[in-house]
Amino acid sequence: MRKNGRGPLDLRPILLEPRVSKHAEGSCLVRFGDTHVLCTASVDEKVPPHVYGTGAGWVTAEYGMLPRSTHERMQREAARGKQTGRTLEIQRLVGRALRAAVDLRAIGPRTVTLDCDVIQADGGTRTAAITGAYVALVQAVRSIQKRKQLAHDPVKRSVAAVSVGIVAGEVHLDLDYDEDSTAEVDMNVVATGEGALVEVQGTAEGKPFARAELDRMLDAALAGLSRLKELQEAALRTP
């Protein structure tokens, strides 16, 4: 039995609280157990140079951890003068994941930026960020629609993410920090609401894992992602 009485294939308690920022076009406070991430979506009526002139829009992301989101205080990356490789990797992952949800041409020549700030970290910050950022993105798109600036809805599919791994020889869904630290295999799975894979990041620690174990982990992840889709839909129905 895991923490909080969870079974191997149970998610942590999940909360998606939308509209937590009065300034951002979209926002969501997402909680995966003791991992809490604030996701905001901002709309800018311009696009980066590589998109300029195409008529399409862009969706991008930034990610960061507050200094006391972990057991010991971390120095802010701004104070160090550079972002870590981990930060750059995660924010690129979040951006790729969210672009899979939308038709960039239908967004028009504007940029939606998802800012994902980790308030408290207990494993799975990138998967929580993607799941919450999708909710914020949809709200931002709706704000553009209210201004009657979109001919078609650019959101084509939902996207969520969850971690999965092998701990003590058993497949575990939605790993917390302690489980992640001792896992023989650690994997992050991003998928659409229909179950199509967007990105899979998997690493073995110490020894390789079999194809059959990979299949079991993917099955567990997709089952968890189906539940996350339901929670996203419920959050977006909240007035």
From Swiss-Prot:
It is an enzyme of class 2 (transferase). It catalyses: tRNA(n+1) + phosphate = tRNA(n) + a ribonucleoside 5'-diphosphate. Keywords: Nucleotidyltransferase, RNA-binding, rRNA processing, Transferase, tRNA processing, tRNA-binding. One of its GO terms (molecular function) is 3'-5'-RNA exonuclease activity. This is Ribonuclease PH. One of its GO terms (biological process) is rRNA processing. Belongs to the RNase PH family. Phosphorolytic 3'-5' exoribonuclease that plays an important role in tRNA 3'-end maturation. Removes nucleotide residues following the 3'-CCA terminus of tRNAs; can also add nucleotides to the ends of RNA molecules by using nucleoside diphosphates as substrates, but this may not be physiologically important. Probably plays a role in initiation of 16S rRNA degradation (leading to ribosome degradation) during starvation. Its EC number is 2.7.7.56. It comes from Anaeromyxobacter dehalogenans (strain 2CP-C). Phosphate binds at R86, G124, T125, R126. Homohexameric ring arranged as a trimer of dimers. SUPFAM superfamilies: Ribonuclease PH domain 2-like, Ribosomal protein S5 domain 2-like. The keyword Iron-sulfur does not apply.
